[in-house]
């Protein structure tokens, strides 16, 4: 069975060595506490979700695809997508950069955007 290994080291290199994102975040009072460990934790957990939940859906996505009921105009996603999306939302991935007052995690967009480069984009 195929597997997916997220390029975490590459992503960490870009965030920390190329962009030096934590230096810029220190200039923003609301994100001054976002450090390299926090960024790495988000990348690692996002990578787990991508490889363990999202990536395996490629098979059902390719084999089943979406179906359209022409009478009701409803689209049905392939097997597993609804459950994976529920896990995506339950895990807080959809609200990483949203205001905590509204259920978000308050992370800077630069950090929350990184998970979109992983196969989780299949679920959004």
Pin down the residues of each PLM region:
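Non-catalytic terminal/interface segments that mediate subunit docking, oligomerization
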Residues: 75-113
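Conserved small/polar residues in nucleotide/adenosyl-binding loops
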Residues: 114-120
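Extended, charge-enriched "interface" segments that sit outside catalytic cores
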Residues: 1-69, 75
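Intrinsically disordered, low-complexity regions enriched for glutamine and histidine
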Residues: 10, 120-121
């Amino acid at each position: 069975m195929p597997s997916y290994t997220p390029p975490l080291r590459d992503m960490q290199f870009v965030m920390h060595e190329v962009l030096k994102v934590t230096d810029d975040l220190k200039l923003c009072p609301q994100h001054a506490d976002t450090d390299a460990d926090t960024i790495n934790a988000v990348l690692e957990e996002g990578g787990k979700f991508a490889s363990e939940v999202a990536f395996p859906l490629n098979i059902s996505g390719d084999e089943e695809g979406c179906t359209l009921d022409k009478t009701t105009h409803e689209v049905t996603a392939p097997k597993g997508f609804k459950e994976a999306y529920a896990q995506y939302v339950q895990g807080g991935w959809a609200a990483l950069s949203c205001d905590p007052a509204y259920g978000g995690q308050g992370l800077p967009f630069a950090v929350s955007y990184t998970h979109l480069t992983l196969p989780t984009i299949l679920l959004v």
